[in-house]
Curated annotation (Swiss-Prot):
GO terms for cellular component: extracellular space. Thyroid hormone-binding protein. Probably transports thyroxine from the bloodstream to the brain. The gene is TTR. L-thyroxine binds at residues 35, 74, 137. Keywords: Gamma-carboxyglutamic acid, Glycoprotein, Hormone, Phosphoprotein, Secreted, Signal, Sulfation, Thyroid hormone, Transport. It is found in: Secreted. This is Transthyretin. Residues 1-20 form the signal peptide. The lineage of its organism: Eukaryota, Metazoa, Chordata, Craniata, Vertebrata. Coiled coil: none annotated. Highly expressed in the choroid plexus.
C-alpha cells in the first residue's frame, strides 16, 4: 500500500511540475494532452502509441485522434478546441508495444482512460499515466482554457 501511495504522489508531482512550467504558445490552445512516465526507469515514456476514441450516438467508439508520445513522454496537438466537443472519450495507451520494445513482457495489453469532456463548458485536459509492466496509474488535470 505504501508503494501505491508513493506512485500516486510521484504522478501528482509530475502533473504539478508540468503545469507549473510555462507552456508554449501552441500548448496553451491544446485542449487534450497526454503525458506518460515509465515508473521502472524513472523517465518519460517515449514513443507510446496513443489512440483517442469518441462515443457515438449508436454507442460505438469512433476513432477521434492518434499519435505517439515524444521524447518528453508528452503528446500535444491531438485535437482543436473546435473539434473537442462535449462527449464521452476514451484514451488508449499501447503499453504492450512500449514494454516489448524494451525487452519486457507486460501484463496489460493497453491502459485506457474513459472520461466525459466539456460537460460544464470548454475545458483543457491533461491525462497523465504512470506505467510499469504489471500496473498503471492515471490522473487528470482539468483546467479552464488560457487566453
Amino acid at each position: 500500500m505504501a508503494s501505491f501511495r508513493l506512485l500516486l504522489l510521484c504522478l501528482a508531482g509530475l502533473v504539478f511540475v508540468s503545469e507549473a512550467s510555462p507552456a508554449g504558445a501552441g500548448e496553451s490552445k491544446c485542449p487534450l494532452m497526454v503525458k506518460v512516465l515509465d515508473a521502472v526507469r524513472g523517465s518519460p515514456a517515449a514513443n507510446v502509441g496513443v489512440k483517442v476514441f469518441k462515443k457515438a450516438a449508436d454507442e460505438t467508439w469512433e476513432p477521434f485522434a492518434s499519435g505517439k508520445t515524444s521524447d518528453s513522454g508528452e503528446l500535444h496537438g491531438l485535437t482543436t478546441e473546435d473539434k473537442f466537443v462535449e462527449g464521452l472519450y476514451k484514451v488508449e495507451l499501447d503499453t504492450k508495444s512500449y514494454w516489448k520494445s524494451l525487452g519486457i513482457s507486460p501484463f496489460h495489453e493497453y491502459a485506457e482512460v474513459v472520461f466525459t469532456a466539456n460537460d460544464s463548458g470548454l475545458r483543457h485536459y491533461t491525462i497523465a499515466a504512470l506505467l510499469s509492466p504489471y500496473s498503471y496509474s492515471t490522473t487528470a488535470l482539468v483546467s479552464s482554457p488560457k487566453e
